[in-house]
Structures are given as C-alpha cells and as structure tokens.
C-alpha cells in the first residue's frame, strides 16, 4: 500500500459515491455508494478487500450520516487505510468560467462553487455539503481537499463554440454560455486514446462520446476540447436516459400556452420524463432498448432516435478537426457496453470511412477496451472511463 491514498467523493443530491484509490498505480482499496438519502430506505453498499457489504443508514439519513458511517464503521474495520489517506478529491459538476483546472479547496473556492450553483442546482449544493462534512470528518486533511471540476476540461473552447446567439449582455452580465459536463471523463479517455493510437496528446484529433444515463460528445483538436454537446446545463445535446437533449426551444412556449403546463412541470418533463424513458414510455435503461430492439416497437423507436442524434453530433464535429480525424472514442456505461449503439451510430457514418467489425465490437464490452473498426478503416475505439483515478491523481498532485 503506497502513501498516495486518496479518498474520492462524488456527492449527488440523493447519493454519495466514494472510493479510496492509490493515486500512483490506480489500485482501489474501497469503493461504495450511499443512496436514497432523505428516504426511509437510505442505505450504503461498499466493497473492501474483495468482499461486498451493505447496511441501512436509518430513515431520512443523508450525506452527514453516510460520511459518519464511512469513517466510524467502514474505515474502523481497517484503520491503516484512514491513517494513510493523504488527500480528499471532490467531484464538482459546475465551476463556471472561473476554474480551468483542479484547485485546493479554501473559502474562495467554496464561494466559487456556490456562485455556480444556479447552473447545477441539484449538484453544486450537494457538493458543498460533502466538502463541509469531509472537513468535519477528516480534520487532519483540512488543507488537503481538492475540487475537480467537470467543466474545467471544456474551458479551452473558443468563443464561437461556447456562445449562444442570444443578446451578448446575457453572457457578459449573467454567464449564459455553453459549459459542458463530463469533462473529467473526456480528459481521461483523451489521454488513453493518445497511448492506444501512439500519438502525442497535443497532436490528437478525436471525437469522444461519454454515453451513460447522461451523455455528451466532445470535439478534441490537438488534445484540447473545442466543442461539446452539453450546454449551460447538462440538458442540452444527446438523447439521454430521462433528459430530452436538443429540442426546439419554442416547444416550451407551446406546452405552456396550449397545454397549460407550468415552468416547473415542463422542467420536470424535460429532465426526468424524456429521453429513452419518454420514447419507450417504459424505462430509461438502455439495456431494455438494446435487448428488445428487434421485437418491440418502443425499443426500436428509442434506439433509432438515440443513434440518429449521436451520429449527427459525431458527423458535425468532424467539421472542427482541421481535415484530420484520428478516431472516435466511446466511453461511459452505454458507450462501453452497448455494442448495438456503437454499430448503429457508426453505421450511419460510412461516408467518413467508419466500418464496424462485428466481432471486435462485441469483444469490447464489460470493462474491456479495444478497437472496434475493421482493419484499414477509420479507427473507432472503446475505452472504459476512470474519473475517480483522475480525481485521485489531481488531489495527490496538488497536495503533495
């Protein structure tokens, strides 16, 4: 066990993902999830030394109770883990324009996260609770907490990518612009793709597709992000599990004026009742859509719209590659496992030289990386993401 152990925290509004990772070699000593916060069935599950365990946190439990449990129950089983922690890394969904890289957390950073909360109202307030609880639970690491921003990697976008064609004052005075998300994942797979393609990162032109319950595509030119599909918030872009992605903005006025829906109802519909869930009217789970594609109309409908949108984004981002596209990369829960999504999407892009090898595509699932294109055609590659490792490495580097 090295002396570079980092506790990685990802606090959501109703859950907390946690892990202890060796920032040098990536070994994971503890991983877990506390979920169903504020509900009677609040629970925590974890894996340590290869064994999986689970416990109830008590009705209504939330971040504070979860961190208490991690410190006083889980880590009490293995005190040497606590003793060797050198830093705590926090995933922060939105850093606005202020943060272009990870930073050690102090009062000004806490204020910066608060200032960006209007762009991520479900996430940033939860991150702040996580930071406050971590400072309480690990007083010996009070100056070793690091914020790693999902938006940071996208801060290299040029103005023509991040500006909306709205009154310019909305950007200058209120920060209304494209920020993107999943930046830590897009950054990680960019580094890994450079190794697999045997190219220096700064010469790499790729399109990265992080596809999970949320999804985004990024255009990476010379190793830097030049455009991404998520916008001011994570609602723009691709079809997602429950999010609509791109729509005609006037649909909102139509729903309000014609159907009498309130702003809150429309917001809920676009974020929680749309996407794959809206199209199937059954589930947000891509596995259902893939498994039933050939037999159920709802699954086929959802898959076709999903892949159509994804292919359009990949195709449009080739225009930003300065005439050279080295590869398309798939990552995230769907990107890594849904072979059908990859095959159908790239099947629409034959004009760009993509041809999927069926066997290679099926082999690159369940944590396995690999090229999925036919020999001699444009590279397409699957790379399992590892956001926790990036967070651990940044936390370790900044607190060394």
UniProtKB/Swiss-Prot annotation:
Binding site for substrate: 91
Temperature dependence: Optimum temperature is 35-37 degrees Celsius.
InterPro entries in the record: Ac/propionate_kinase, Aliphatic_acid_kin_short-chain, Aliphatic_acid_kinase_CS, ATPase_NBD
Cofactor(s) needed: Mg(2+); Mn(2+)
Consequence of gene disruption: Does not grow on ethanolamine and tetrathionate under anoxic conditions; complemented by acetate kinases EutQ.
The protein's Enzyme Commission number: 2.7.2.1
Annotated metabolic or biological route of this protein: Metabolic intermediate biosynthesis; acetyl-CoA biosynthesis; acetyl-CoA from acetate: step 1/2
Catalysis performed (reactions): acetate + ATP = acetyl phosphate + ADP
Positions bound to ATP: 17, 210-214, 285-287, 333-337
Molecular functions per Gene Ontology: acetate kinase activity; ATP binding; formate kinase activity; magnesium ion binding; propionate kinase activity
pH dependence: Optimum pH is 7.2-7.5.
Entry keywords, A to Z: ATP-binding, Cytoplasm, Kinase, Magnesium, Metal-binding, Nucleotide-binding, Transferase
Subcellular localization(s) per the UniProt record: Cytoplasm
Active-site residues (renumbered): 150 (proton donor/acceptor)
The record's free-text note on cofactor binding: Mg(2+). Can also accept Mn(2+).
Activity regulation annotation text: Inhibited by EDTA, butyrate and citrate.
Entry-linked SUPFAM superfamilies: Actin-like ATPase domain
Keyword Transferase in annotation: yes
Annotated site, Transition state stabilizer, chain positions: 182, 243
GO cellular component, one term: cytosol
HAMAP family: Acetate_kinase
Family per similarity comment: Belongs to the acetokinase family.
Quaternary structure and partners: Homodimer.
Protein name: Acetate kinase AckA
Gene: ackA
């Amino acid at each position: 066990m090295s002396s570079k152990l980092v506790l990685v925290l990802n606090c959501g509004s109703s859950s907390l993902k946690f892990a202890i990772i060796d920032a040098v070699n990536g070994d994971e000593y503890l991983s877990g999830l506390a979920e169903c916060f504020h509900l009677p069935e609040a629970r925590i599950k974890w894996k340590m030394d290869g064994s999986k365990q689970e416990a109830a946190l008590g009705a209504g439990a939330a971040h504070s109770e979860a961190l208490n449990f991690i410190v006083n129950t889980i880590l009490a089983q293995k005190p040497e883990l606590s003793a060797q922690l050198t830093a705590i890394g926090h995933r922060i969904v939105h850093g606005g324009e202020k943060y272009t890289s990870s930073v050690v957390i102090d009062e000004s950073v806490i204020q910066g996260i608060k200032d960006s909360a209007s762009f991520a109202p479900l996430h940033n307030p939860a991150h702040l609770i996580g930071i406050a609880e971590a400072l309480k639970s690990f007083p010996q690491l009070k100056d070793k907490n690091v914020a790693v921003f999902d938006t940071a990697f996208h801060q290299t976008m040029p103005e023509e990518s991040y500006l909306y064609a709205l009154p310019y004052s909305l950007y200058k005075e209120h920060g209304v612009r494209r920020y993107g998300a999943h930046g830590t994942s897009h950054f990680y797979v960019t580094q890994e793709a450079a190794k697999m393609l045997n190219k220096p990162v700064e010469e790499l032109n790729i399109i990265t597709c992080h596809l999970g319950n949320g999804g985004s595509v990024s255009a990476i030119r010379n190793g830097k992000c030049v455009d991404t599909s998520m916008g001011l918030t994570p609602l723009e872009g691709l079809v997602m599990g429950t999010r609509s992605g791109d729509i005609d903005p006037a649909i909102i006025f139509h729903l309000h004026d014609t159907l009498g829906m309130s702003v809150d109802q429309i917001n809920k519909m676009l974020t929680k009742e749309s996407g794959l869930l809206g199209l199937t009217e059954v589930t947000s789970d891509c596995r259902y859509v893939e498994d039933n594609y050939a037999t159920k109309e709802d699954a086929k409908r959802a898959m076709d719209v999903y892949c159509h949108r994804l292919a359009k984004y990949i195709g449009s981002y080739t225009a930003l590659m300065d005439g050279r596209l080295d590869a398309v990369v798939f990552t995230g829960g769907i990107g890594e496992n849904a072979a059908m999504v990859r095959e159908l999407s790239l099947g629409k892009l034959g004009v760009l030289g993509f041809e999927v090898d069926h066997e290679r595509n099926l082999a690159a699932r369940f944590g396995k990386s690999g090229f999925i294109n036919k020999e001699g055609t444009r590279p397409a590659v699957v790379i399992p993401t590892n956001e926790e490792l990036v967070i651990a490495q940044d936390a370790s580097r900044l607190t060394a």
